[in-house]
Amino acid sequence: MHGRAYLLLHRDFCDLKENNYKGITAKPVSEDMMEWEVEIEGLQNSVWQGLVFQLTIHFTSEYNYAPPVVKFITIPFHPNVDPHTGQPCIDFLDNPEKWNTNYTLSSILLALQVMLSNPVLENPVNLEAARILVKDESLYRTILRLFNRPLQMKDDSQELPKDPRKCIRPIKTTSFSDYYQTWSRIATSKATEYYRTPLLKVPNFIGQYYKWKKMDLQHQKEWNLKYSVIKCWLARKRMPHEVTHSMEEIKLCPTLIPTTDEIFLESPTAINSITDIYETEEEGWKSDTSLYENDTDEPREEEVEDLISWTNTLNTNTSED
């Protein structure tokens, strides 16, 4: 159920729409009709002709026993408008004792329009505006136009966008392939073309592997030990580089590889000596290939599977480094 103030304001609103006063528009901006927005134009044949003033009116539940609070949104340069608070200087609005319950919304708006077009120069609240108006009216007109320029822009339909966030450009989507290519160029971890040693592309490597395997097949434990030493040497010798060098310059394995018998005849420090030999040897595969020129036996299927498993393990380790 609505209160007394709401019913009175609803009556005043209907009266205002019925009379349709020229240069005055008002509408409630809250459901309880306590907050209003108002636009008042200056009267014709006055200094304020053509200017539009925007105001807010705040009513309370005590209306119409108490006057509302009226303020200008854009404070005009006017002798009867407080330059700090934006409140108009009208006696029945400033002094509750002079308020009359017979006053309505229409009477308040008409009083504001008359005050704007016919300022009272006695006891003004804006002394500077009163002084200029009395001394030089043309200068006062110029100042009024400057103060109300933003309102004139509204009439010329030159408003700024209401929501500046709508001017922000949308986020551009990027495909995964483009992202991956960009990442490969700028990431700290290089792509697969770096730090790789293609062992399977080395000439005679596969043949040498099978010959070693055949010689040491009867000593599987020793072969595994030798294989571990070779992997250790490769890990220590590998240096960061791009795969653009000649394959003849890459020394992947040593030329001197001790046999199984030598490993077991030597002292336990033999493995360390083998590692030292690997680090200092710089010759290629030529000397080793001469030792096995007459060996043409084909590897068995089981050995082929072992080779595939071994090469997969080796390539995985080197690429991950």
Curated annotation (Swiss-Prot):
Organism superkingdom: Eukaryota
Pathway where it operates: Protein modification; protein ubiquitination
Keywords linked to the UniProt accession: ATP-binding, Nucleotide-binding, Transferase, Ubl conjugation, Ubl conjugation pathway
ATP-binding found in the keyword field: yes
Domain UBC core: 4-153
Pfam families per UniProt: UQ_con
Any one GO molecular-function label of the UniProt entry: ATP binding
Polar residues compositional bias, start-end: 309-321
GO-annotated cellular components: HULC complex
Purpose of the protein: Catalyzes the covalent attachment of ubiquitin to other proteins.
Protein name listed in UniProt: Ubiquitin-conjugating enzyme E2 U
